UniProtKB/Swiss-Prot annotation:
GO terms for cellular component: large ribosomal subunit. InterPro entries: NA-bd_OB-fold, Rib_uL2_dom2, Ribosomal_uL2, Ribosomal_uL2_bac/org-type, Ribosomal_uL2_C, Ribosomal_uL2_CS, Ribosomal_uL2_dom3, Ribosomal_uL2_RNA-bd_dom. This is Large ribosomal subunit protein uL2. One of the primary rRNA binding proteins. Required for association of the 30S and 50S subunits to form the 70S ribosome, for tRNA binding and peptide bond formation. It has been suggested to have peptidyltransferase activity; this is somewhat controversial. Makes several contacts with the 16S rRNA in the 70S ribosome.
Length: 274
């Protein structure tokens, strides 16, 4: 994948970059795998904002992506590599030998015409899905399950990957993109390879309007608010907030740990790097 730059025809265009979409092979998605997406504006069923800075954005359809990879021992041919507006990664349309069609996350170097397989005895090549017990140590993997049969939940963003570090008892130790080393059951499925679209992190948004196209609303600073709205609000003229940085609800921010101990904490062998 390449990054496309623009001539500085305006202030917003000057630093803007965009994907060249070289790997995309079709512009129209598979209609049988589309769902309508309803916008929430970050509101819950009471109409109250539960997720700030969400709203607007381009209308889009949801693509049903197969994270489970539960069609075991049935080969599938890659029919196309497509754009998905709901995620940073590209998706690949698979045509299975029994006639079914499904989308999967497109790994790096997966091409149209390739054959992929989900099996305990599949080859170790990008796009193939296997249980962790059947994958050699040191292999680069993505789309990793945390619960058997639930579907992949880890390492799904563009360019991300995890690495299988060790196997001990009924658990495998997997190094995640954050640097965390975590124990995962050996019977959980994972897909071989790195998620594609690796240059996604190098894209520059360039202007505020492009963030709005993505459904992201502006983030207002606390010091620019009134005292009723934020602990940093108020004061005559410009102020620094007058206290250590806090959230709108008074919880310290900038490094303060808010994660509570939970049952799954015992599966973390090494915490994520700072």
């Amino acid at each position: 994948m390449a990054i496309k730059t623009y001539k500085p025809t305006s202030a917003g265009r000057r630093h803007q970059t965009c994907s060249a979409f070289d790997e995309i092979t079709t512009s129209s998605p598979e209609k049988s795998l589309l769902l309508t997406l309803k916008k929430t504006g970050g509101r819950n069923s009471f109409g109250r904002i539960t997720s700030r800075h969400i709203g607007g954005g381009h209308k889009k359809k949801y693509r049903l992506v197969d994270f489970r990879r539960n069609k075991i021992d049935i080969p599938a041919k890659v029919a196309s590599i497509e754009y998905d507006p709901n995620r940073s990664a590209r998706i690949a349309l698979l045509h299975y030998s029994d006639g079914e069609k499904r989308y999967i996350l497109a790994p790096l170097n997966l091409k149209v015409g390739d054959v992929v397989l989900a099996s305990t005895s599949a080859d170790i090549k990008p796009g193939n899905s296997l249980p962790l017990r059947a994958i050699p140590l040191g292999t680069i993997i993505h789309n990793i399950e945390l619960k058997i049969g639930k579907g992949g939940q880890l390492a799904r963003s563009a360019g991300t990957f995890a690495q299988l570090m060790a196997k001990e008892g009924k658990y495998a130790q997997v190094k995640l993109p954050s640097g965390e080393v975590r124990m995962v059951l050996l019977d959980c499925m994972a897909t071989v390879g790195q998620v594609g679209n690796i240059d996604h992190e190098n894209v520059t948004i360039g202007k505020a309007g492009r963030s709005r196209w993505l459904g992201r609303r502006p983030k207002v600073r606390g010091v620019a608010m009134n005292p009723v709205d934020h602990p940093h609000g108020g004061g005559e003229g410009r102020t620094s907030g007058g206290r250590h940085p806090v959230t709108p609800w008074g919880i310290p921010t900038k490094g303060y740990k808010t994660r509570k101990n939970k049952t799954s904490s015992r599966f973390i062998v090494k915490p994520r790097t700072k």
